[in-house]
């Protein structure tokens, strides 16, 4: 089964519709693949009716469906471990000392969303949904970000280029390393002591002391069946999620999944023909276009 999937919300309807229109016009009008929408809250009737009108395939809508870890659980756990007085711990992540210290440090590195509990919870929820959501029992999904626009006419069925042995089909993005990424590398070193499976010599697509390159999640095809049914992947991903790094180190879903793919040497291919634009910092235009027809790159 092949699905186009968006993690979105009612508030993002405008961006969702523009993205759907782009994907339908540039690609899906030829293949009519179904769309699946997942959100942390119920979708409104208006959201469902307007999105289903644009889709050339059928639409499915789902919500949480899985239990994700919220920031309060980590507040109480860490508070207990360092012998803080639990009676003094307020149920707000902003009042957690450890969180505040880590967030302040990350803010000094000019990172966004470091004080956003919703952002951290969303990263945790997306990864757990991909692994465990009961409605996501799909072979392959094309993960598309609300707001993304395809800039090339795509005449070939992208799913057909995905080989049985492939795990991920995407683009790469390189970013400056921050203290949270160094913490992830340390966590994986600790995991390495407990587990012998995997090549831990090179976690990222590319890395040096200052930069790391990872798989970009906002326009990628994933073999969910292979990921979900491979305990080696799920064990490492669950270990990283269980460490609380999404809250205390600002790990994103792309950080966690890319690290797992890198350690376990996932077979990956580059989406070289799929040009897209998300924002001024996130875009891609193919250098050679052997079969896509036309592009309108900025």
Swiss-Prot record:
Q: Which GO terms describe its cellular component?
A: cytoplasm; Golgi apparatus; membrane; nucleus
Q: What is its main location?
A: cytoplasm
Which GO biological-process labels does this protein carry? cell wall mannoprotein biosynthetic process; protein N-linked glycosylation; protein O-linked glycosylation
A single Gene Ontology MF term assigned here is: alpha-1,2-mannosyltransferase activity
Name the keywords, alphabetized: Cytoplasm, Glycosyltransferase, Nucleus, Transferase
Q: Which residues form a coiled coil?
A: none
Q: Does the keyword Ubl conjugation apply?
A: no
Provide the E.C. number(s) assigned to this enzyme. 2.4.1.-
- Highest rank taxon of the organism: Eukaryota
* Subcellular location per the Swiss-Prot or TrEMBL entry: Cytoplasm; Nucleus
The residues annotated as the active site are 220 (nucleophile)
- EC class (word): transferase
**Which Pfam families does the protein's record reference?**
Glyco_transf_15 (PF01793)
Give the matching InterPro entries. Glyco_trans_15 (IPR002685), Nucleotide-diphossugar_trans (IPR029044)
What task does this protein carry out? Probable mannosyltransferase involved in O-glycosylation of cell wall and secreted proteins.
Question: Which family, according to UniProt?
Answer: Belongs to the glycosyltransferase 15 family.
Record PANTHER family: ALPHA-1,2 MANNOSYLTRANSFERASE KTR1 (PTHR31121), O-GLYCOSIDE ALPHA-1,2-MANNOSYLTRANSFERASE HOMOLOG 6 (PTHR31121:SF14)
- In Swiss-Prot or TrEMBL terms, this protein is called O-glycoside alpha-1,2-mannosyltransferase homolog 6
């Amino acid at each position: 089964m092949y699905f186009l999937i968006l993690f979105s919300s009612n508030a993002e309807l405008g961006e969702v519709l523009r993205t759907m229109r782009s994907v339908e016009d540039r690609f899906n009008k030829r293949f009519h693949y179904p769309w699946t929408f997942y959100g942390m809250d119920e979708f409104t009737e208006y959201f469902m009716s307007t999105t289903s009108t644009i889709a050339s395939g059928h639409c499915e809508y789902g919500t949480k469906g899985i239990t994700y870890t919220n920031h309060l659980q980590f507040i109480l756990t860490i508070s207990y471990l360092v012998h803080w007085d639990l009676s003094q711990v307020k149920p707000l992540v902003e009042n957690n000392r450890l969180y505040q210290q880590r967030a302040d440090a990350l803010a000094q590195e000019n990172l966004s969303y470091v004080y956003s509990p919703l952002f951290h919870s969303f990263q945790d929820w997306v990864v757990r949904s991909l692994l465990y959501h009961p409605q996501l029992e799909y072979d392959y999904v094309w993960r598309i970000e609300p707001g993304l626009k395809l800039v090339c006419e795509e005449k070939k069925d992208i799913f057909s280029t995905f080989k049985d042995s492939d795990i991920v089909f995407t683009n790469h993005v390189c970013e400056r390393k921050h203290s949270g990424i160094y913490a992830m590398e340390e966590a994986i070193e600790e995991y390495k002591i407990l587990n012998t499976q995997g090549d831990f010599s090179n976690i990222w697509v590319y890395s040096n002391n200052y930069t790391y390159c990872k798989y970009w999640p906002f326009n990628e095809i994933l073999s969910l069946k292979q990921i979900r049914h491979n305990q080696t992947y799920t064990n490492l991903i669950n270990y990283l999620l269980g460490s609380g790094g999404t809250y205390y180190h600002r790990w994103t879903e792309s950080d966690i999944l890319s690290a797992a793919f890198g350690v376990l040497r996932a077979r990956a291919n580059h989406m070289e023909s799929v040009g897209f634009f998300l924002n001024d910092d996130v875009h891609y235009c193919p250098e050679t276009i052997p079969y896509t027809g036309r592009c309108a790159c900025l």
